[in-house]
Amino acid sequence: VARPIVLSNGELHVGLNKFGLVHDFYYPYVGFENHAGGANLRHKVGVYVDGAVSWLDEDPKWSFRFEYPHTALIGHTRAKHEDLNIILEFDDCVDSDMSVFIRNVHVVNLSDESREIKLFMHQAFAISESGSNTDTAQYLPDSDALLHYRGRRAFVISGDHNGDPFDQFSIGLFGIEGHEGSYKDAEDGELSGNSVEHGRVDSILRFTLNVPAQSSERVHYWVSAGMSTREALYIHKQLQDDGIHERIHATAAWWHSWLAPALKQLDAVPVAYRELFLHSLMIMKSQMDKRGAVIASTDSTMLNYSRDAYAYSWPRDGGFALWPLIRLGYTDEPYRFFEFCHRGMHPSGYLMHKYRADGALGSSWHPYLHGETVAPPIQEDETAIVVFMFSQYYAMHPDAGLLKDFYSSMIVPMAEFLAEFVDSESGLPKPSYDLWEQDFMTTTYSTSVTYAGLLAAADLAVIAGDHAHEVKWRTAAEDIQQAARTHLFNTERGVFYKGARWENGQPVLDTTLDNSSIFGAFLFGLFAPDSDEMTRSIATMTEQFAVSNTQPGLPRYENDDYRRSDDSITGNYWPIISLWHAQYKLEHGDVEGATAVLDFVKDHALTTGMISEQINPLDNEAIAPAPLTWSHAEFVSTILDMIERK
């Protein structure tokens, strides 16, 4: 339940599953409107040979290998069937310049005899995630293509073999009126040629190949996407005119160009991590919409709290994803993310829980009423990290135009909110939801990010000549730090508290050992790396979780039951947490310890480099979603820390 291959151009995003089949098809936003996200929306691939059809996702004798071999977001899938003596090799991409998904299919006959092999390519959409059964599919004889459309979404499907189009097709219904889908029409090797359906529709193409012994043939297949049938057909025609080899070559060149800032650093990256370093950056880019949203994960197999997926833009995940890009000198992605946050900011200066890729408010399980306390359903750290990241970006690109665009209209209201969202009794930030989205309290983690955000805002105020705000925000940050020293360290246990709530003037302290408290205080400078509190917290954490160079995996916190593999363990390993520990180790010169963590994360990634949200400590299996943008970001950040230590 992961995506071994993801492909994207910031508008069309395709995720392939463990059978090499389309499982996610987002358009026109990365992470929003998944037209192939349902359980029965697999785009099946099959071969008809020796009198029977074999589907890649049904016949258990197919074996698969996945990789990104080209230093570009071009996936390679190899499917082999020993009994049928057939190999299917797919070179897949989403075109960098236009919204079309391309598959260059290499059909290899391993037999000692010449054979007729029929390749079936099937597609099923629920356009715009609609359950209204109002999609239409039609055969377009003048274009040698099939068209699926609903409203302002249109997909044109076609292909060729040696310059000739597919030789048969059919359009059908699935999931309604007793129909399973048009792919059932392929079981005798022949398609009926039904040319139109409306409702819940799917379609299938056939390519008939005569393949000599120990030889091969190629089939080109594509799905173009448009906001109208005219646009989708224009892209289809453009692809036919250019040829898919030219488009794949142009896409590879685009990715090489995009990777240029990272390639400049590559000589300094330890050889063992170079491939995953580059793959992580490309995978992160694949999760970024061209209008600024940074999606947590486009892997739709994971339903968060069993009701929703991770295909939203959390400002926190976006901030952490952009940190290594900012350090590498990227400009476009951070700028567009800040524009996205600017558009989504509440009039009171805070950011909400999460957003859809189109900028609308995302679903939430956080209430406005918390017992008798009324408070916005937010996580304060998400506002603070955007202020902090903007200051990091400005430090890399000190441009007066940046302040003109964002200082008065975004930084000032955000920093004012942070400075005033403070509990008068404790001096700490008021309660909000923690970064794990579970607990309403004042956490050490959120306090740390708020402190750093206010200091960052004060530094920006100096540059903007805004003396009054500079004094106010710096004072607020210093007061919060002093309150944290007073309240947030558990001297008895020798570790930071997870957080606290104040009831009738008395603190109710949460003593859970939460690794975000330790590493948040470290990353955002709330406590010095060599302070007594930090040193003792790391020692307590190391002992509590029995962490070592041979077992560097760490959970989020003790007794974390979220998707826990077994009640016998305290929680699943999270690469994010382990990599934070590696960053702490590098700060203290422990390169060996950091290397152990990097090896651990690399060894648990998929063959294409996908890093998941969690790892099962019992069988070392990746736990979806994969990829998780934040996991990849922390891997890249750790590598950059390692380079800086040198």
Positions of the model-derived regions?
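An extended acidic
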Residues: 1-82, 155-184, 250-276
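C-terminal capping/lid segments that line or modulate ligand- or cofactor-binding pockets
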Residues: 1-46, 310, 321, 356-357, ...
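Low-complexity, Ser/Thr/Pro/Gly-enriched N-terminal "stalk/linker" regions
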Residues: 1-9, 62, 163-164, 179-182, ...
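Short Pro-Gly-centered flexible turn/kink motifs
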Residues: 66, 115, 209-229
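Helix-terminus loop motifs that line ligand-binding clefts
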Residues: 66-71, 78, 291-305, 312-313, ...
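Polysaccharide-binding surfaces and accessory modules of carbohydrate-active proteins
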Residues: 78-80, 84-188, 203-205, 237-261
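Extended ligand-binding clefts on enzyme/binding-domain cores
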Residues: 157-178, 268, 276, 349-356, ...
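Active-site acid/base region of carbohydrate-active enzymes
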Residues: 165-179, 267-293, 339-364, 375, ...
